[in-house]
Amino acid sequence: MAYDFKKEFRELYRPSGKPGVVTVPPMSYVAVRGKGDPNAEGGEYQNALPLLYGVAYAIKMSKKAPREIEGYFDFVVPPLEGFWWQDRADGEIDYARKDDFNFISCIRLPDFVTREDFDWAVSEAAAKKKLDLSAVELLRVDEGLCVQCMHTGPYDDEPATIDAMRAFAAERGYAPDFSEARLHHEIYLSDPRKCAPEKLKIVIRHPIKLI
C-alpha cells in the first residue's frame, strides 16, 4: 500500500477544528514562487500548479522508469500547499487585497528525494509534459513552533479562524513570529473544482514564539 503522509502525520494534515500548538519538522518541497490573485485565470498561481504536479508525479512514477532512486517507496502525492504573504511588517494577510499576494506554491516530497533525483524529475516532467519548468525549485522548510487549525468553509472566511488561532495562542503565552522564512501557511485538503465552498477544508498554520 502506498505511503500516505496525511495518514502517517495526522497531527499535521488532519488537525482539529479548534486551534492547537504543533512543532513541525523540516520538510522538502517542490515549489514555485509567484505573485498576484490566486483566482486570476492564467495568473502566476494557476500556471504554477501543473509544474508542481508534473514534478511530484515524475518522482512517484520513477518506479516505472529506468532510474532507480535510492530509498524509494511508493507514496500518495501529498496535498497542495501554499505559503502566503503581503508587504506588511506584521505578516498579516488582507484578504481584500488579493492582487498584492506573494506566494510559494508547493507539494511535499519524501525525504529520500536528493538534489540529483529532483533535477532528474524536472527534466523528465519537462520532456513528457512539454512544460517550461525553469521556475521550479527544491525547497527545504523548517517551520518549527506553530499554531494551526482546520478551517472549513470559503477562503474569504479564513480571518475568523485566524482570529481564533491568535486568541488561543495569546492565552497560552505565545505571540506571532512572522518573518521572511516563517509565513502564513495553508494546506488544501479539498479540490475547489469539485467541492462546495462551505465544505472546503484547509489547514491554516502560523508561526509563533513564547513571549
Predicted segment positions?
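A solvent-exposed interaction/effector surface
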Residues: M1-I211
